[in-house]
Amino acid sequence: MPISKTLPYNAIEQIKSYLLQLQNTICVSLESIDGQTKFHEDSWQRAAGGGGKTRIMANGNVFEKAGVNFSHVSGEQLPASASAHREELAGRHFSALGVSLVIHPQNPYVPTTHANVRFFVAEKEDSEPVWWFGGGFDLTPYYGFIEDCEHWHQTALNACLPFGETIYPKFKRWCDDYFFIKHRNEARGIGGLFFDDYNEISFDHSFELMRSIGDHFILAYEPIVARRKDIPFGNREKAFQNYRRGRYAEFNLVYDRGTLFGLQSGGRTESILMSLPPIVHWEYNWHPEKGSNEEKLYTDFLPAKDWLK
């Protein structure tokens, strides 16, 4: 008997329950790592349908700014960013649920990170629903450490292995391609996992894969923070961190599909733009000093590679 891709009647409730639990688990872990500052929760409603819970930590001991956002929005018409490449979505009402987070640390030796898991369904009367999962996690170091990159990608591999040996290399390559700043001709970071439009085998299979990736995020990030958060740094390192944060802002405002979807669908601007760094510095035509640790980021870490060889 073939496995069905039919959407269970309670799919939204299942996913929402998991996402709220994931948001809480991640926030508890980050508060424990920081040891000083708690998240502030801001619940919000969207006039066109839905709402969410945005949790923000600011000026902590370890984290300069961290945002962990849950949203569940719905509407009668899809924004252009979602329907442009999928004609079958025209004329359907939609629901989109997700947890999205971005963490900007105080210490430049601790990488910035982003993670997202989401579900999307578009429905129309007398038609089968169109649904899929998406998400992933990626790492943006300022000063690279090989052992951190290997740990990050090993944890990403562990998240994917239960679903087949082809998943990690596919999602890893997708991440490298997606988080590439075309106008700079450089990667945003050292990658990780990225997937979208995932609707394979069955709803249960697809949901389990999304959960595995969501659950492995904190396992990937926490040990790296623990190793790097107490390394001494000075003005030079902080200035480089703020300069590189400019690349983060450029990517999010120019290319990121989640940002574009949120803004075009009338989402909550404060929650959508929580990903932006608290302090950013642009400097005209700046280049790192030859042989410096700053240059090594560009030469040894940002170019896409297989970290598990």
Curated annotation (Swiss-Prot):
<feature type="binding site">
    <location>
        <position position="114"/>
    </location>
    <ligand>
        <name>a divalent metal cation</name>
    </ligand>
</feature>
<dbReference type="GO" id="GO:0006782">
    <property type="term" value="P:protoporphyrinogen IX biosynthetic process"/>
</dbReference>
<dbReference type="InterPro" id="IPR018375">
    <property type="entry name" value="Coprogen_oxidase_CS"/>
</dbReference>
<keyword id="KW-0479">Metal-binding</keyword>
<dbReference type="InterPro" id="IPR036406">
    <property type="entry name" value="Coprogen_oxidase_aer_sf"/>
</dbReference>
<keyword id="KW-0560">Oxidoreductase</keyword>
<keyword id="KW-0350">Heme biosynthesis</keyword>
<comment type="similarity">
    <text>Belongs to the aerobic coproporphyrinogen-III oxidase family.</text>
</comment>
<keyword id="KW-0963">Cytoplasm</keyword>
<protein>
    <recommendedName>
        <fullName>Oxygen-dependent coproporphyrinogen-III oxidase</fullName>
        <ecNumber>1.3.3.3</ecNumber>
    </recommendedName>
</protein>
<comment type="subunit">
    <text>Homodimer.</text>
</comment>
<dbReference type="GO" id="GO:0042803">
    <property type="term" value="F:protein homodimerization activity"/>
</dbReference>
<feature type="region of interest" description="Important for dimerization">
    <location>
        <begin position="248"/>
        <end position="283"/>
    </location>
</feature>
<dbReference type="GO" id="GO:0005737">
    <property type="term" value="C:cytoplasm"/>
</dbReference>
<feature type="active site" description="Proton donor">
    <location>
        <position position="114"/>
    </location>
</feature>
<feature type="binding site">
    <location>
        <position position="104"/>
    </location>
    <ligand>
        <name>a divalent metal cation</name>
    </ligand>
</feature>
<dbReference type="InterPro" id="IPR001260">
    <property type="entry name" value="Coprogen_oxidase_aer"/>
</dbReference>
<keyword id="KW-0627">Porphyrin biosynthesis</keyword>
<dbReference type="GO" id="GO:0004109">
    <property type="term" value="F:coproporphyrinogen oxidase activity"/>
</dbReference>
<dbReference type="Pfam" id="PF01218">
    <property type="entry name" value="Coprogen_oxidas"/>
</dbReference>
<feature type="binding site">
    <location>
        <position position="100"/>
    </location>
    <ligand>
        <name>substrate</name>
    </ligand>
</feature>
<feature type="site" description="Important for dimerization">
    <location>
        <position position="183"/>
    </location>
</feature>
<comment type="pathway">
    <text>Porphyrin-containing compound metabolism; protoporphyrin-IX biosynthesis; protoporphyrinogen-IX from coproporphyrinogen-III (O2 route): step 1/1.</text>
</comment>
<comment type="function">
    <text>Involved in the heme biosynthesis. Catalyzes the aerobic oxidative decarboxylation of propionate groups of rings A and B of coproporphyrinogen-III to yield the vinyl groups in protoporphyrinogen-IX.</text>
</comment>
<feature type="binding site">
    <location>
        <position position="183"/>
    </location>
    <ligand>
        <name>a divalent metal cation</name>
    </ligand>
</feature>
<dbReference type="GO" id="GO:0046872">
    <property type="term" value="F:metal ion binding"/>
</dbReference>
<feature type="binding site">
    <location>
        <begin position="116"/>
        <end position="118"/>
    </location>
    <ligand>
        <name>substrate</name>
    </ligand>
</feature>
<feature type="binding site">
    <location>
        <position position="153"/>
    </location>
    <ligand>
        <name>a divalent metal cation</name>
    </ligand>
</feature>
<feature type="binding site">
    <location>
        <begin position="266"/>
        <end position="268"/>
    </location>
    <ligand>
        <name>substrate</name>
    </ligand>
</feature>
